[in-house]
């Protein structure tokens, strides 16, 4: 797979709109560094999410623990692997985690994960005994990434942790030591939002009608259909204000609507929230993840059914006419994660494994993809550009 550096024009090739793609990785299957592929089932190594550290140029990828997945938190160096299908190495210091769905890097270069504390198949429970879900942070500024924070989420708050979706890290004092941090974790099974106050070592959950599925989503892949009914799944944070609060944008996995709530209300343990409905993105625009770019004021969405990445400028009203596509490709199958790094590079990920019963995959061509673009270039000439 060639890398298209500094692509100036938008080209159309075999139905794929390639807008300023700067980097692309594609895997037929996941190979772990130093581990014999015969010791695990490649069909069960299904990555779900990633994070890119712009300083070290490393990518961290999570692979939920399904029998017999050997490593749940992995990494590779993009300077050593600028393209292709790199093998994944074990993340240092990750021996005490069970299964992870997503990593997030904050402004202080801390890598956060939410360990669900259990495996999804009973045959693995003897090897990985069930424990409380936990929020864990690692310091990426130091060698071997030492663990610097660990908080076990009470079961009454976590609910069913196998329903953890996306989460956001809210550093309210990034220039003042990073000690005041809140974590917001979406639980799409329980239709709740979990809040963790790092400073007080406390957590609570919030429920609201907008966290529930709007409808049943029909996922179509190769003629097969699967019905999804997913509650709140993705969350991203806007710009920090003078009081240390931000707008939090969220969506349901089975919804085409977008909502906003101020983090000031999320931080109140016994408070009430009054979300603002921002609008409807249009039919077949259901997404699992979204990411805000402070530089362009644009939110990007991974639409899992349309196989595209869409955008919306937060300075505009939200409706079908204000949404545009920055990437659209038939090989971008089941987009599961998206983020903007500290260099304003947009990264988005598809794992090629839609949750369809008796899914038949062939491993003769890549189906797992990770793609990067510059945020400004990606929206040039689209409805998301504000001149």
From Swiss-Prot:
Main location group: secreted
Quote the subcellular location field of this record: Secreted
Entry keyword set: Secreted, Signal
Give any Pfam family that matches.
Answer: MRJP
Q: Which Gene3D superfamilies match?
A: TolB, C-terminal domain (2.120.10.30)
Region forming the signal peptide: 1-18
| Tissues in which the UniProt entry reports expression | Female salivary gland (at protein level).
Task: Identify its protein family.
Answer: Belongs to the major royal jelly protein family.
What PANTHER family has UniProt attached to this entry?
A: PROTEIN YELLOW-LIKE PROTEIN, PROTEIN YELLOW-RELATED
Function statement: Probably modulates blood feeding of sand flies on vertebrate species by binding and sequestering different mediators involved in the host response. Binds biogenic amines. Binds octopamine with high affinity. Binds serotonin and dopamine with medium affinity. Poorly binds histamine. Does not bind noradrenaline and adrenaline.
Please state what the protein is called. Answer: Yellow-related salivary protein ASP2
